[in-house]
């Protein structure tokens, strides 16, 4: 997903793609959809999941473009991220099939979803769009697990592409984690588990390694942070 500082009304914030149509944060439809998302979904998420945020947005790392990763555990996790990073325009690099999920997929497409190409030659427009966004100070969000598994409590195997792309463009990476936490009523009765987004410390690209070795080291650092945060559920909150 690309997270970018919302530059509506300026020359920035636009990234073209032949894969999912043209994304333009200045177009009325995008602005209407974003307004609806930010005014409707936060209270719904709080009511259904007790949705909350742990950590802080590292704005100092987002000024010149960066890349974030998050586990993929809910059909509307992209909307949850959009609500948390509400001062930013968001674009999502995701499996093409995820962009066609009923309702959720339509929202992602309208918000700037980028479908992973099925063929190698399809990467050219994708990388062009990513570079344009990063050059404008945007933030690319990728789901390294690839497949969406609703309600998954474990951290699944990562695909290397997210970390290779980060090393290619030499941008810092911001790991995020969606996790479930126990909730109780005032009387002490167990309620449906809540959801929280944990924003972890940004990780810079290794300077002493290049290529696949740099990507592997970056993946190891990111996974360690995310796994530690997953196991820390219940010991921290916002």
Segments (PLM) and residue ranges:
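A transmembrane-helix-recognition feature enriched in membrane-embedded lipid enzymes
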Residues: 2-57, 87, 102-111
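Non-catalytic C-terminal accessory region of glycerolipid acyltransferases
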Residues: 2-25, 124-238
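A generic secondary-structure micro-motif detector
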Residues: 30-31, 93-94, 119-120, 127, ...
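Soluble or luminal CAZymes and related metallo-dependent hydrolases
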Residues: 32, 36, 121-122, 214
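Short, flexible loop segments at the rims of nucleotide/cofactor-binding pockets, characterized by
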Residues: 43-49, 68-70, 116-121, 151-153
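Short amphipathic alpha-helix with an adjacent loop that forms part of the alpha/beta core around
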Residues: 57-61, 131-132
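Catalytic core of membrane glycerolipid acyltransferases/transacylases, capturing the structured
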Residues: 60-120
């Amino acid at each position: 997903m690309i997270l970018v500082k919302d530059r509506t009304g300026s020359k920035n914030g636009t990234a073209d793609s032949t894969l999912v149509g043209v994304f333009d944060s200045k177009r009325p439809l995008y602005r209407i959809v974003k307004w609806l998302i930010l005014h409707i979904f936060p209270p719904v998420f709080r009511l259904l999941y007790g949705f909350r945020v742990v950590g802080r947005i590292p704005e100092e790392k987002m000024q010149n473009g960066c890349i974030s990763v998050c586990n993929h555990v809910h059909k509307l996790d992209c909307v949850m991220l959009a609500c948390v990073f509400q001062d930013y325009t968001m674009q999502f690099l995701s499996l093409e099939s995820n962009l066609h999920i009923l309702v959720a997929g339509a929202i992602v497409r309208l918000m700037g979803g980028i479908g992973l190409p099925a063929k190698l030659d399809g990467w050219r427009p994708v990388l062009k769009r990513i570079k344009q966004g990063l050059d404008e100070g945007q933030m690319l969000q990728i789901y390294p697990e690839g497949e969406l598994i609703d309600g998954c409590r474990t951290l699944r195997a990562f695909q290397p592409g997210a970390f290779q792309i980060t090393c290619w463009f030499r941008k810092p990476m911001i790991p995020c984690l969606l996790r479930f936490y126990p909730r109780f009523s005032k009387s002490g009765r167990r309620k449906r588990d809540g959801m929280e987004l944990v924003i972890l410390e940004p990780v810079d690209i290794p300077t002493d390694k290049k290529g696949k070795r740099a990507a592997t080291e970056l993946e190891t650092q990111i996974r360690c942070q995310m796994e530690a945060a997953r196991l820390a559920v219940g010991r921290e909150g916002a």
